[in-house]
């Protein structure tokens, strides 16, 4: 388990560095990220490289038992580069050229920029690639820029030509006869700005993804050619940010990382947990938090400080969801620059700020020997998966039909009730292998590719339960409407035995009577509603609309399709339900699929999550299961401790568990203080 911070030694005289490193060591830190914005210090003028200062910083850290994550500095090109080569600066959609002096203001597709990126990364890799004090590399920082230059337009046209081969195919897939958009020359195709042809917009998103992947792959290849095999490579992504397809980019990385900031307010674990799950799902591996806030940020409407103890909960919350590393941003704020008031561990006077005390407590816990040993080689392993697709998000966000329709909010609507019930979820690519899951949910999977159709049908035919929500199966892989009603693809419609007869953007909530638990439950649907039609005599309605707009009255709002011979089936939910109805639907799905909660009792605001050793049979000798219990509230809570049978799913008598954070055995009830954490393992 790694714990640390981002440090910028280039901001400070070398005479200060030893004091900083001593404070890191005292805080329990065993890793530090450096270098990712220091290009002008590494290469003050073209081709003149200065790494002695970096060598000194690395040695200071190493001598104090602190490993180094080395960042490539390519998010912040030096002024001499952008001045002499203005073509390296990105062109915004407005036609304005990005200014030097910010970050990520470069054009990632610029051949000139790529040349200089290769040079600096190669110099770093040759110098530090065989250095065992460096455990890994972070490439760049928070990819985000989209370039709209004429050069990018030409490369986009070439990309489309490679993909579609002929203009006839492109025109057909994009329905360009509409509004006389038909192209007779590849050079006629524009970069979409604002609303445009759905096929063109999706194609440009795919192109942007490829640009970033090429940019990243250049750095990956240079480092791998010069680095030790054990030096890993990652990038720090930004949660739900969607300018490119993260699944594509992470294929070339060893694992994914992300930067987690709360901003205004306080953390809601039911919302943040699924972003951890999203990041873990990029590679289906544990992840790192390369940045998280040490108290507050500086860019939110109200940059309030986290409550005392809240950061500890957040740290263990991340670990529970698969984080193997956690670093604060930043160690100390520079006297100048754009982020002067951002939270930090060290103040302007060089002394620890109040947050340093809590960070030290967190560090002592995360890096304690018994904790590290217990968490080693463990990861979250779940029975429920939620599917996620950038293509679907792009498709819906370009044509929401109701501006209140947010595909990420729909995903969270389905994930939150599981978090409240101590049931973890995996968030997977829509084309992922689904073997081993009891329940798959596809929230607003509007665009379904042939590969996804094959995966989903195989899953149901193999006995799985698949939930398709509103807007599933509207479009094909080119962002064109399927020539059939939802769920679109014939294979899915045949399995479902249900189709969407019509969809409605709602201006007012409509009544929905839910019957899935055997008794009517009065609820509502809002934003979006679909009128379902049962195609199979074996399909059954699970909910009906009440009197509303006349079009929905009395029609099915949810339905379960016929069971396949394997026992699998598809369930269609045609409404965005109110919270109480969503909760009751979740309970019904759990009962239908036999999903087992990580902890049988639940208390509002208390999270229970587990990490396990993959491949170990529950309860078998050598199996390792670590349970994280977090009180996210400011009140004392009590949580009954279950018997061993609740941990393994089998029979068993009352059992004893050890809290690794206190060294004490847990009694029959966990007494949780405000913002308290328990790390439980089975006692000998």
Task: Name every feature range the model reports, one short phrase each.
Residues 186-189, 229, 239, 250, ...:
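Carbohydrate-binding surfaces of carbohydrate-active enzymes
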Residues 19-25, 33-95, 219-227, 446:
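Aromatic-lined substrate-binding rim segments of carbohydrate-active enzymes
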Residues 5, 24, 32, 61, ...:
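Conserved, mostly hydrophobic/aromatic
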């Amino acid at each position: 388990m790694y714990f640390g911070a981002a440090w910028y030694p280039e901001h400070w005289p070398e005479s200060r560095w030893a004091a900083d490193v001593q404070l890191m060591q005292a805080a329990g830190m065993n890793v530090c990220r450096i270098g990712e914005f220091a290009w002008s210090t590494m290469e003050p003028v073209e081709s003149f490289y200065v790494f002695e200062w970096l060598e000194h910083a690395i040695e200071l850290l190493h001598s104090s038992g602190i490993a180094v994550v080395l960042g490539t500095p390519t998010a912040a090109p030096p002024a001499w580069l952008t001045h002499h080569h203005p073509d390296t600066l990105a062109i915004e959609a407005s036609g304005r050229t990005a200014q030097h002096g910010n970050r990520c203001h470069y054009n990632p597709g610029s051949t000139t920029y790529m040349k200089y990126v290769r040079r600096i990364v190669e110099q770093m890799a040759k110098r530090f690639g065989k250095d065992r004090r460096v455990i890994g590399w972070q490439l760049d920082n928070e990819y985000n820029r989209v370039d709209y230059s004429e050069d990018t337009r030409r490369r986009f046209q070439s990309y489309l030509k490679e993909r579609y081969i002929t203009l006839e195919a492109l025109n057909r897939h994009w329905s360009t006869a509409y509004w006389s958009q038909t192209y007779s020359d590849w050079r006629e195709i524009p970069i979409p700005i604002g609303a445009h042809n759905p096929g063109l917009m999706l194609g440009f998103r795919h192109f942007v993804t490829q640009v970033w992947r090429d940019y990243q792959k250049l750095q990956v290849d240079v480092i791998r050619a010069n680095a030790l095999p054990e030096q890993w490579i990652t990038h720090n992504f930004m949660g739900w940010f969607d300018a490119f397809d993260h699944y594509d980019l992470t294929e070339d990385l060893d694992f994914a990382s992300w930067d987690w900031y709360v901003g205004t307010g306080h953390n809601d674990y039911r919302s943040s947990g699924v972003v951890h799950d999203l990041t873990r799902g990029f590679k289906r591996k544990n992840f790192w938090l390369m940045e998280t806030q040490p108290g507050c940020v500086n860019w939110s409407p109200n940059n309030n400080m986290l409550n005392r103890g809240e950061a500890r909960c957040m740290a263990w919350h991340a670990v529970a969801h698969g984080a193997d590393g956690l670093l604060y941003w930043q160690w100390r704020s520079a006297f100048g620059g754009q982020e002067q008031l951002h939270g930090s561990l060290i103040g302007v006077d060089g002394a620890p700020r109040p947050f340093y005390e809590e960070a030290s407590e967190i560090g002592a816990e995360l890096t304690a020997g018994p904790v590290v040993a217990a968490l080693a080689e463990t990861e979250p392993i779940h029975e429920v998966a939620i599917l996620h697709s950038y293509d679907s998000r792009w498709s819906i966000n370009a044509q929401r039909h109701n501006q209140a329709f947010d595909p990420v909010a729909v995903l969270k609507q389905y994930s939150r009730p599981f978090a409240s019930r101590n049931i973890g979820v995996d968030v997977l690519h829509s084309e992922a292998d689904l073997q081993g899951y009891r329940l798959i949910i596809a929230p607003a999977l509007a665009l379904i590719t042939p590969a996804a159709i094959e995966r989903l049908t195989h899953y149901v035919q193999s006995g799985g339960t698949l939930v398709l929500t509103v807007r599933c199966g509207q479009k094909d892989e080119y962002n064109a409407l399927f020539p059939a009603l939802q769920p679109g693809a014939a294979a899915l419609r045949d399995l479902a035995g249900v189709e969407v007869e019509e969809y409605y953007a709602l201006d007012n909530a409509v009544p929905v009577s839910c019957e899935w638990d055997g008794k009517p439950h009065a609820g509502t649907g809002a934003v979006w509603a679909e009128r379902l039609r049962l195609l199979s005599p074996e399909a059954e309605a699970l909910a009906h609309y009440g009197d509303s707009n006349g079009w929905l009255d009395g029609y099915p709002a949810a339905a379960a399709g016929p069971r396949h011979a394997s026992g699998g089936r598809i369930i269609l939910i045609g409404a965005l339900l109110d919270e109480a109805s969503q909760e009751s639907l979740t309970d019904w799905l759990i009962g239908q699929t036999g999903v087992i909660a990580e902890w049988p009792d639940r208390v509002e605001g208390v999270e229970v999550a587990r990490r396990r050793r993959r491949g170990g049979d529950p309860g078998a000798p050598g199996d390792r299961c670590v349970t994280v219990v977090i009180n996210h509230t400011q009140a004392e809570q009590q949580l009954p401790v279950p018997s061993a049978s609740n941990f393994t799913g089998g029979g068993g008598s009352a059992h004893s568990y050890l809290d690794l954070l206190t060294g004490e055995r847990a009694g029959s009830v966990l007494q949780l203080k405000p913002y308290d954490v328990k790390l439980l393992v089975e006692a000998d």
